[in-house]
UniProtKB/Swiss-Prot annotation:
This is F-box protein At3g54460. Gene3D superfamilies: 1.20.1280.50, 3.30.40.100, P-loop containing nucleotide triphosphate hydrolases, Tandem AAA-ATPase domain. SMART domains: DEXDc (SM00487), FBOX (SM00256), HELICc (SM00490). InterPro entries: F-box-like_dom_sf, F-box_dom, Helicase_ATP-bd, Helicase_C-like, P-loop_NTPase, SNF2-like_sf, SNF2/RAD54-like_C, SNF2_N. Residues 97-107 have a biased composition (Basic residues). Zn(2+) binds at C580, C583, C603, C614. Residues 720-885 form the Helicase ATP-binding domain.
Length: 1378
């Protein structure tokens, strides 16, 4: 190779050889492509071809059937590219077109749209970069002059079938311009896919060239040559779709979660001891055992524990086990979890970028290639900074809430860390001198420290950022625009910030008059602070209005708006006025000892209790005395441009930022250009304002002018501007205004907080409060539950509380790009999302997700027992939103890296995707599992199959009959028919149908159905043409049966919608479906008129699958029908009957347990010593009644997902006299909590009836039995429900019983879930019934087999006919398989 390229890596690829005798080891070869075949060609012309050539793609796809054809695709740049538009189905011409069955037209009214069948991705080729053959990639890169290669044959092996394969060593060379910034000119993604296979093990390469034994042989053959992946790389470590890989189960997400670190339940022992410094016999702390020391340390608060932990290693280890002010001892797995979470919060580790591959050339030069984008870096290895926080994913019921509270208590009093490079402003708030905040502008954003702040800037907010480029010529002093003066640290060091509104070439300097000290609240003496009314009226308040305000504003018995009683004139002269930074109201400070020089000041700092809230009205000054100082003005004779005035003007402009339009800009420029002689007119006759046209625009700048301190008056239709009255020797500070107009207006302030923000579902607020009240020392934590009606200032939210609890709905409501929420203006110590997986439940951009991501916090935590919903084909995609909330730098901030680096490789079962995911989750997720803990009693599950009661069975069959009739008459169960429920286009209607069928297993219902008289007449006329006599009883019987139903002629079972055959037999759907070619009545055998697929194609079914009985289908009438409606009032449910019987038995057992308990107590009463008070004994026994008795009582949890089913259960439990509580939507929260308290404390209340709204957060560890009234498809939800009882604190085994109706869709689902092998085949794409699905995302597991459920629906028979129906159904299924 020429000197302009370097050897950067190598790989070995495997190819087929037609004539191995002509090929020798060491032979050179070159890559080629003749348009149809890509491979290598040796020097003697021998072709080495791919073992699965791409040219066979079309035949490979075609062999899988029409339903597998997505797009043939094209190979470009070494990748398989898929066209954007689907290939349209070709509609063949049919000479025998027939009308759409009338029974179909009632379903979707004859849709004419062509069907598009679901297609399965062809994994043998692969859509993920890296799974396509490296030979294709090499050819594309060589053709595009991205690299050069040298190839030689190093090994040839022969298989059992006589096939010969060769191993080709490929050396890859890159140009030396790489170290001068060279990048791949084309096909970067292809290059990235190729470089994942390259190796820089130069010792291995030497061994390969020397012919040393590096080949692992099995049965005399080289195993890696014959166990080949799609990439054709010898011994590929990435497992690119290896055939029949035994590691397929490793790509199940629940298997990934199981492999994550679990704290376990082992106690941590410490060997450190305190030793005396001498051999003295004096006793000391070294004589105390660890248990004694721990009991002492548990009495200390957080601050004292921090102090004593610094003494020695023993105390450091002992304090790590203690949670201050917690009223219980943590379990070992909780202690380990708290330790892990503290370690994650202490510091963010810096590590190498997971997507950059490291390479070394043969002569030692290093470079790095991005495995997704193909970007090359030759300098230092790229590094990424880990986030602080993570995902706390203990299984439900293991005490995540207590663990989270322990973390909060361990770090109580710790303030959030501000971003680097910004000064902190310290201030006092309610006697707390350690309050702080910081400010920044848009030009101070950095990629790391302020990335969180960028997120809540919407495009609309960016448009509101004002630029005053036009004012640059006005800067006579060439002053450097600076940040607001109050932004500084305690040492008076200020931030030197640039102004994003100016170009860098302007040279400016800081004027001497600006010392950049903190803004001074000066003694204003006789200054009246209500000089700037917000309305356009008189220059001062009239005495009448003043009196009115005095009469209306009263607080704590003190009248506001006038001089305070008891003040002397000397007090007035020493008066100090302070402006609140939150509400901008002015407060008068009388205490002369108060420091007036500082940063932020708030109403809460006021010594006067009548004015310590921002909600209190502003005080008024009622003396008309000369004003010697006023912000925005300077003393005559001075140069102006005072720092206080610059800050004042800047704050006013920022406050009115939304009002600054082009017209307002012109007015401000006019004001800033006024000379002194013009300003002097404001003292006397008034200065006419700028003429800007529209009155609406004038209102904007007039508000700003008044905020500056100027007064307006209309004289003869002309608005004139004046100085305030009683102004003495002061001039408007125009130079300061010029500087202020050049300040950036997009300033944000964040208040540093010691608080933790906890966001929970609405139904878990009371759970958190209960846990805090029960397990945390009283008054230890300052708690705020932020409800919808509460309005708080940001600084109060940040500094007044240790824990702020709010809901996801509140979080969503707070998102407003045009207005900053108080939540966004706080820099939280920690943000926790309980049940945080709900952020990833939607792929769309929701308000709550945007708000959660926009929150600024040092530490971010997700608490959930179910990180992803149970959606096997798309569940991994739900993790990326969680990573974005956590601000994970690689995969959370860059969706492209997530998709190409983890999601697509993982779904393609490539090892690199699994390893990256595992590496990511092992770093930021922890999960304890119940099976690893020994303190929890077992959970015993069983499924109980029940039979219908006769009335309920008839209701169920009526709905099933309607569904099956639709499917059968749509070209005889053909899923290609666009009006069939099995068709992929009908997925929404199919889901509704399945939900109704599920509900009908629990609740009786009805379909209001009327015949279409015209259609039935057509049917009867057709029968008359087939020799039916109009005046016979047979004619009347058939007509009446089609209208009202009849018994099946073959099996005798009642059918509401019978099928009439051309031979005039009335059959049920089961009997007619036994044979599609002839009548199934014994002795009849009438042959139907069959129509073949070749003549059957039409818009309703462009791709027929099989022949159908044309005359039978067209003979059937259609029926007008309404939706299926549940009727719970009249339901006789066998499920509830079974439940009542079980509850009665448990209730009898409870009575015996309580009687036995009371008898034992009475025996103990006789053993009490003489003289014991009977009243005391009675009180003691009564106290035990609610506690000790509960240990012996069976409590039952009843769960249903359907409100109608809950009503049936509620009705029949009440009738049976069983006392129960209820928690279900839409009950009010108060009633739910009342019912829960009754269930917990009343021994006679043995059952709690609830729906999914109570499946989260409840601690029902005293419950012994759980009844699931219907199968729960989402297994994560089922686990949540069971975990209400099966959790820490449970003392007895938990019995879980799932009630399932026999022979229904419920039984189908239970059988499917119990068959793990079938589930695996379905999820891998091999299950035949799932082939018709489209590419839409599957929401739950049962979505994958919806069509299978409907196609196997069967009627429910009663009593003796069950066996007959079972045999009929078996025969029907065998016929369909045949």
């Amino acid at each position: 190779m020429a000197d302009d390229h370097k050897l950067c890596g190598f790989l070995c690829t495997v190819l087929s050889v037609d004539s191995p005798d002509l090929l020798q080891s060491g032979s050179s070869c070159f890559i080629f492509n003749d348009g149809s075949v890509t491979g290598f060609k040796s020097e003697n012309g021998l072709i080495l071809s791919l073992t699965n050539p791409i040219s066979n793609l079309q035949s490979l796809i075609s062999s899988k059937g029409d339903h597998d054809v997505e797009n043939s695709g094209t190979i470009e740049d070494g990748r398989l590219e898929t066209p954007q538009k689907r290939r349209k189905c070709v509609e063949g011409e049919s000479s025998g077109k027939r009308k759409t069955p009338k029974s179909k037209r009632r379903v979707l009214s004859g849709s004419k749209e062509k069907t598009v069948q679901g297609r399965k991705r062809v994994k043998s080729i692969g859509m993920v970069n890296g799974s396509i053959s490296v030979v294709q990639q090499l050819h594309a890169l060589v053709a595009n002059k991205c690299l050069k290669i040298i190839c030689r044959v190093v090994k040839v092996d022969k298989g059992e079938n006589g096939e010969e394969r060769a191993v080709v060593l490929v050396d890859v060379y890159l140009p030396i311009e790489l170290w001068s910034g060279w990048q791949f000119p084309k096909s970067q993604a292809t290059a990235a896919a190729l470089f994942k296979h390259l190796s820089c093990d130069w010792g291995l390469r030497v061994s390969i060239l020397d012919g040393k034994s590096i080949w692992e042989e099995a049965n005399g053959r080289i195993k890696a040559i014959w166990d080949l992946s799609d990439c054709h790389v010898f011994d590929c470590k990435l497992l690119c779709n290896a055939p029949n890989s035994p590691k397929r189960r490793l790509f199940k997400l629940h298997e990934i979660f199981k492999s994550l670190p679990s704290p376990g339940n082992h106690d941590v022992s410490y060997s450190s001891r305190v030793l005396p410094s001498t051999d003295s016999c004096v006793s000391g702390v070294w004589d105390l055992s660890d248990d004694v020391l721990i009991s002492i340390l548990m009495k200390l608060d957080t601050k004292d524990l921090f102090s004593i932990a610094a003494v020695c290693r023993l105390f450091r280890s002992l304090t790590s086990l203690i949670v201050p002010c917690m009223n219980l001892k943590l379990f070992p797995h909780q202690q380990a979890a708290v330790g892990w979470m503290l370690e994650r919060e202490r510091k963010a580790e810096v590590s190498s970028h997971p997507l950059y591959l490291s390479f070394d050339t043969e002569d030692g030069f290093s470079f790095y290639v991005n495995a997704v984008t193909g970007d090359i870096i030759t300098e230092a290895a790229p590094m990424v900074k880990d986030f602080r926080g993570g995902m706390f994913c203990d299984e439900p019921g293991l005490g995540k809430t207590i663990t989270a509270l322990s973390l909060i208590l361990k770090t109580q009093g710790t303030m959030a860390d501000p971003p680097e490079g910004l000064p902190i402003v310290w201030c006092t708030h309610k006697s707390d001198k350690k309050c702080a905040y910081y400010e920044y502008t848009s030009d101070q954003f950095t990629s790391n420290s302020m990335s969180a702040v960028k997120r809540f800037q919407s495009p609309s907010s960016c448009r509101n950022q004002v630029s005053f480029e036009a004012f640059r010529p006005l800067l006579e002093s060439k002053s450097l625009p600076f940040k607001q003066a109050r932004l500084m640290d305690p040492d008076d060091q200020t931030l030197e910030s640039k102004n994003s509104n100016f170009e860098n070439e302007f040279e400016t300097h800081i004027p001497a008059s600006l010392d950049l000290k903190a803004q001074c609240r000066k003694s204003l003496g006789n200054v009246r602070k209500n000089l700037l009314p917000a309305y356009n009226g008189a220059s001062e308040l009239s005495e009448v209005m003043e009196a009115k305000r005095i009469s209306n504003w009263k607080k704590c018995g003190m009248i506001t708006g006038c001089k305070r009683k008891g003040l002397t004139d000397s007090d007035v002269e020493s008066d100090i006025w302070m402006q609140c930074d939150s509400c901008s109201k002015w407060r008068r400070i009388i205490d002369e000892g108060v420091s007036v020089t500082g940063s932020a000041w708030f109403c809460s700092n006021n010594n006067d209790p009548a004015y310590q809230s921002c909600n209190d009205p502003e005080e008024l000054w009622d003396k008309s005395q000369p004003i010697k100082y006023l912000q925005g003005f300077y003393t005559k004779g001075a140069s102006g441009e005072e720092s206080d005035n610059i800050s004042f003007f800047t704050s006013v402009l920022r406050e009115h930022k939304s009002s600054v339009s082009s017209t307002v800009k012109k007015a401000l420029i006019w004001l800033a250009k006024l000379p002194l002689e013009k300003l002097s007119q404001m003292e006397t006759v008034g200065l006419p304002g700028p003429v800007l046209g529209l009155k609406l625009d004038a209102l904007g700048f007039q508000r700003i002018f008044r905020a500056f301190g100027l007064k307006s008056r209309v004289e003869k239709g002309v608005t004139k501007w004046f100085y305030p009255k009683f102004l003495e020797n002061l001039v408007f500070d125009v130079p300061a205004l010029k500087v202020a107009l050049c300040q950036p207006l997009d300033t944000f302030r964040l208040y540093l907080s010691k608080a933790t923000l906890i966001v929970v579902p609405t139904n878990l607020v009371n759970h958190w409060l209960t846990q805090i009240q029960k397990h945390v020392c009283s008054d230890q934590l300052r708690i705020l539950v932020w409800a919808d009606h509460i309005e708080l200032s940001p600084h109060s939210l940040a500094w007044d509380y240790d824990v702020v609890i709010t809901t996801f709905s509140r979080l969503s409501a707070e998102w407003n790009p045009r207005k900053k929420s108080p939540l966004i203006q706080v820099h939280w110590l920690r943000v926790m999302l309980d049940e945080g997986h709900t952020l990833g439940s939607s792929v769309s951009l929701t308000n709550k997700f945007q708000m959660a991501v926009s929150l600024t916090a040092c530490n971010r935590w997700l608490l959930t027992g179910t990180p992803t919903p149970n959606t096997p084909n798309s569940q991994l995609s739900h993790i990326q939103p969680l990573l974005k909330f956590l601000h994970e730098e690689v995969y959370g901030e860059n969706p492209k890296f997530w998709e190409a680096g983890i999601l697509r490789p993982f779904e393609a079962e490539m090892e690199e995707g699994r390893l990256r995911l595992l590496q990511l989750l092992q770093r930021c997720m922890i999960s304890s599992r119940k099976k690893d803990l020994q303190m929890i009693p077992p959970c015993i599950k069983k499924v109980t199959y029940l039979n219908f009661l006769p009335g309920h069975a008839r209701s169920y069959n009526e709905l099933v009959e309607t569904v099956r009739r639709n499917i059968l008459l749509a070209d005889w169960n053909d899923p290609s028919h666009v009006e069939s429920l099995l068709n992929s286009k009908q997925w929404k209607f199919r889901s509704i149908t399945i939900s109704n069928v599920r509900l009908s297993c629990c609740v009786a219902g009805h379909i209001k159905m009327t015949d279409a008289g015209h259609d039935i007449k057509e049917t009867m006329d057709a029968l008359l043409e087939n020799d039916l006599d109009l005046w016979t009883e047979e004619y009347s019987f058939i007509q009446d049966s089609l209208i009202g139903g009849c018994n099946c002629k073959r099996c005798g079972e009642w059918c509401r919608l019978p099928v009439i055959t051309p031979c005039r037999h009335l059959l049920c759907l089961d009997c007619v479906a036994l044979d599609s070619e002839r009548c199934t009545i014994s002795g009849c055998g009438y042959l139907y008129e069959m129509q073949t697929p070749e003549t059957l194609a039409r818009p309703e079914n462009p791709n027929p699958k099989w022949p159908v009985p044309k005359d039978l289908i067209e003979l059937q009438p259609s029926y007008k029908q309404d939706d299926w409606n549940p009727d719970w009032q009249s339901t006789s449910s066998s499920k509830v009957s079974y439940l009542v019987d079980r509850l009665r038995k448990l209730h009898e057992g409870n009575k015996k347990s309580i009687l036995s308990f009371n008898k034992t107590d009475n025996d103990n009463l006789e053993d009490n010593p003489p003289g014991t008070s009977e009243a005391f004994l009675g009180k003691e026994l009564h106290g035990q009644d609610c506690g000790s008795q509960m240990v012996f009582v069976d409590k039952v949890l009843i769960f249903s997902q359907f409100l109608e089913h809950i009503h049936v259960i509620e009705q029949q439990l009440t009738t049976a006299g069983i006392k129960f509580g209820k928690m279900y939507s839409p009950m009010q929260s108060y009633n739910k909590m009342k019912a829960l308290a009754m269930f917990q404390n009343d021994a006679d209340c043995m059952a709690l009836l609830m729906d999914g709204s109570g499946a989260l957060g409840l601690d029902l560890s005293f419950v012994t039995h759980v009844f699931l009234m219907e199968p729960i498809w989402d297994k994560s939800l089922e686990e949540q429900v069971i975990s209400r009882a099966h959790r820490m604190g449970a003392k007895r085994p938990i019995f879980v019983e799932t009630l399932t109706m026999r022979g229904t869709i419920e039984e189908q689902m239970m059988r499917f879930l119990e068959d793990a092998e079938k589930s695996d085949r379905l999820l891998s794409g091999d299950y035949i019934e799932a082939k018709q699905e489209t590419t839409r995302s599957r929401r739950t597991l049962h979505d994958l087999v919806e069509s299978n459920y409907l196609s196997h629906l069967s009627f429910v028979r009663s009593d003796g006919k069950m066996e007959f129906a079972a045999s009929q159904l078996a025969g029907l299924k065998d016929h369909q398989l045949a």
